[in-house]
Amino acid sequence: MAARLQEFYKEKVVPKLIEQFGYKSVMEVPRITKITLNMGLGEAINDKKIIENAVGDLTKIAGQKPVVTKAKKAIAGFKIRQGYPIGAMVTLRGERMFEFLDRFVTVALPRVRDFRGVSGRSFDGRGNYNIGVKEQIIFPEIEYDKIDALRGLNISITTTAKNDEEAKALLGAFKFPFRN
């Protein structure tokens, strides 16, 4: 069974974008290819449990086991050696991606304190969107009593859109709450 947003994309979003931008083929319509969740954990150089807890949190949020990212180069100023674990990331595609996007837009974003919408300026010029989340507790899968620290994460939404205008229209069609 396809995810709810996947059906919504095929039935509602594609015709709307074809009408708005005048695409000749259905394959021209921009689509979301992947969503990457990244958690940078610079403080993990002192305590290995931080990495384990962050991996557990990301697993609950994404429904998929993340990869522990390691330092590419040694940086003496940050007391980091090459190969030290300094973060965790997970890439979502297909059905899991649509299910995460659905939960993120309908459940997690409204739980952010003082939420007035996401910035419409976080596009990179090539149709990809980045959003930073300050606390992982906005996701309902994370139990507030069982976390050791509040950690933020970066969410990158990669699309096939050629420019920011097309990408904003695509995410707007998915009911993304842009503030401007």
UniProtKB/Swiss-Prot annotation:
The keyword Transcription regulation does not apply. Belongs to the universal ribosomal protein uL5 family. Part of the 50S ribosomal subunit; part of the 5S rRNA/L5/L18/L25 subcomplex. Contacts the 5S rRNA and the P site tRNA. Forms a bridge to the 30S subunit in the 70S ribosome. This is Large ribosomal subunit protein uL5. It comes from the Bacteria. One of its GO terms (cellular component) is ribonucleoprotein complex. GO terms for biological process: translation. GO terms for molecular function: rRNA binding; structural constituent of ribosome; tRNA binding. This is one of the proteins that bind and probably mediate the attachment of the 5S RNA into the large ribosomal subunit, where it forms part of the central protuberance. In the 70S ribosome it contacts protein S13 of the 30S subunit (bridge B1b), connecting the 2 subunits; this bridge is implicated in subunit movement. Contacts the P site tRNA; the 5S rRNA and some of its associated proteins might help stabilize positioning of ribosome-bound tRNAs. Gene3D superfamilies: 3.30.1440.10. InterPro entries: Ribosomal_uL5 (IPR002132), Ribosomal_uL5_bac-type (IPR020930), Ribosomal_uL5_C (IPR031309), Ribosomal_uL5_CS (IPR020929), Ribosomal_uL5_dom_sf (IPR022803), Ribosomal_uL5_N (IPR031310). Keywords: Ribonucleoprotein, Ribosomal protein, RNA-binding, rRNA-binding, tRNA-binding.
